[in-house]
């Protein structure tokens, strides 16, 4: 841990100021800097550009290449407007360091760990470098355990692994943000954990909307900021590629502190992991590297691995990561999503069709997958229930064309029963969310895994065949559904 050298020029010590270089070349966000012989900065060191007459420019760069002839090539983390050849550059002697700890909760940061929410400086002296190696093999927690979210459809059909990585696939307006906020809320209540949200190359408007919705739903506590459950780190679309490439590491560094020092379970959201790859591709081209397949950087899998391997469970705590994945032109074989898939333990697919029916969360029960759904991990009872639910829904899907053309009456007795149960299951997979209370007026529900399994077993067994299907819509456990059915009858 060290005092952050990148937040202001005054914090660069007198000793560090001795290692001065000068800008010799500027190409967009890439700078070439000459240093005195024998005083070359290390790869990944942060460099701060001094303005004319000691004016602060606040442009921080990161060393990427040592070129020879006492020159380094660095990538800027902010706009290089106004920089000129001959300007002094200070080698801070360390990588970019960002604030970590409880005081980061409820705040918004940029890639350098500077707060951008107009709420004043962050009350902490503890900082951590954004570049570090993944935990050693001996530190890892190799036990396979389920990360219970309290969301029925996720826990039953595509359970998350503690310390795992989940890909979240969904277009605009299908409830991705609400699902993210509910997970942030539930991890705080059920696991006493915190969340870090990394907005990587996303629209400024979306980041602003998410912040306002989090304040409205109580995930960020405006009255008492330290009581908030999430820290936000943004590197928006309009920022240089260096910032977008490193903002994921800034968010991960904050999450690692909660895991390693506070020994908490942490939820890390990255939206969007594709933008991380895209920014790396831009930087790679600017550094003059030969492009690889489809124009991506030759170091694609190395860069992805260095980020993903740090997201893991140790004996102290866990980082469970949920990553939104954009698939360019819906081509799953594109190198960017294909490299991401290699690291994912589960996929949660949001369906526009379910959202149109009003079934929220609109998680597609047949498209969502998880490596954890195995009898030896989740147990026979859970596995059997999940498989029977999927079989029932799959049969219903197959019958929908016949129903649309001929109607329900033309089906066999057995198929009619399957359709009736599938419609109950479909509705029972919906659930009222805590963070949506402000919009829906119905109180949120956290449903434990055992309760979820019991509910679906009762529907599959036929014990609840006599209840109307609307009784299963937007309820928590199965007892609420039976109580709702009694109310509907009266």
UniProtKB/Swiss-Prot annotation:
Pfam families: ATP-synt_ab, ATP-synt_ab_N, ATP-synt_VA_C
Any one GO cellular component localisation term in the record: proton-transporting ATP synthase complex
Positions annotated to bind ATP: 170-177
Coiled coil: none
Subcellular location: Plastid, Chloroplast thylakoid membrane
UniProt keyword list: ATP synthesis, ATP-binding, CF(1), Chloroplast, Hydrogen ion transport, Ion transport, Membrane, Nucleotide-binding, Plastid, Thylakoid, Translocase, Transport
Taxonomy, superkingdom: Eukaryota
GO molecular function: ATP binding; ATP hydrolysis activity; proton-transporting ATP synthase activity, rotational mechanism
UniProt xrefs under HAMAP family: ATP_synth_beta_bact
PANTHER family, per database record: ATP SYNTHASE (PTHR15184), ATP SYNTHASE SUBUNIT BETA, MITOCHONDRIAL (PTHR15184:SF71)
Membership in a protein family: Belongs to the ATPase alpha/beta chains family.
Descriptive protein name: ATP synthase subunit beta, chloroplastic
Species in which this protein is naturally found: Ipomoea quamoclit (Cypress vine)
Phylogenetic classification of the source organism: Eukaryota, Viridiplantae, Streptophyta, Embryophyta, Tracheophyta
Gene that encodes the chain: atpB
């Amino acid at each position: 841990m060290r005092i952050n050298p990148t937040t202001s020029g005054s914090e660069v010590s007198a000793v560090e100021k001795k290692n001065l270089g000068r800008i010799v070349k500027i190409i967009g966000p890439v700078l070439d800097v000459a240093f005195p012989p024998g005083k070359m900065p290390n790869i990944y060191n942060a460099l701060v550009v001094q303005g004319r007459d000691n004016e602060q420019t606040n442009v921080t760069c990161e060393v990427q290449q040592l070129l020879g002839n006492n020159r380094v090539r660095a990538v800027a983390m902010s706009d290089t407007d106004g920089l000129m050849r001959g300007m002094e550059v200070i080698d801070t002697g360390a990588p970019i360091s960002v604030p970590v700890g409880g005081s980061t909760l409820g705040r918004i940061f940029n890639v350098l760990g500077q707060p951008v929410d107009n709420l004043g400086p962050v009350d902490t002296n503890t900082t951590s470098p954004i570049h570090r190696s993944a935990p050693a093999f001996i530190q890892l927690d190799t036990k396979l355990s389920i990360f219970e979210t309290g969301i029925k459809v996720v826990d039953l059909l595509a359970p998350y692994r503690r310390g795992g990585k989940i890909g979240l696939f969904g277009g605009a307006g299908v409830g991705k943000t609400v699902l993210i906020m509910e997970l942030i809320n539930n991890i705080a209540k059920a696991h006493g954990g915190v969340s870090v949200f990394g907005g990587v190359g996303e629209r400024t408007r979306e980041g602003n909307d998410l912040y306002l919705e989090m304040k409205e739903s109580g995930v960020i506590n405006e009255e008492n900021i330290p009581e908030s459950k999430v820290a936000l780190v943004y590197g928006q679309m309009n920022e240089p590629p260096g910032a977008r490439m490193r903002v994921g590491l800034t968010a991960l560094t904050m999450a690692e502190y909660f895991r390693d020092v506070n020994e908490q379970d942490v939820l890390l959201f990255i939206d969007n992991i594709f933008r991380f790859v895209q920014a790396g591709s831009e930087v790679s081209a600017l550094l003059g590297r030969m492009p690889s397949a489809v124009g991506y950087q030759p170091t694609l899998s190395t860069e992805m691995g260095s980020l993903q391997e740090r997201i893991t469970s140790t004996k102290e705590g866990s980082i469970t990561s949920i990553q939104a994945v954009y698939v360019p032109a819906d081509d799953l074989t594109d190198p960017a999503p294909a490299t991401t898939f290699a690291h994912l333990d589960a996929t949660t697919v949001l369906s526009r069709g379910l959202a149109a029916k009003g079934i929220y969360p609109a998680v597609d029960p047949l498209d969502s997958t998880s490596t954890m759904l195995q009898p030896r991990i989740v147990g026979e009872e859970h596995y059997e229930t999940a498989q029977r639910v999927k079989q029932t829904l799959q049969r219903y899907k197959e019958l929908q064309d016949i129903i649309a053309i001929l109607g329900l009456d033309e089906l066999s007795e057995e198929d009619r029963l399957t359709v009736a149960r599938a419609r109950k299951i479909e509705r029972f997979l919906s659930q009222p969310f805590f963070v949506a209370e402000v919009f829906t007026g119905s109180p949120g529900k956290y449903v434990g895994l055992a309760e979820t399994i019991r509910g679906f077993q009762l529907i599959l067994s036929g014990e609840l065949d006599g209840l109307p299907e609307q009784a299963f819509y937007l309820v928590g456990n199965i007892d609420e559904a039976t109580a709702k059915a009694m109310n509907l009858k009266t």
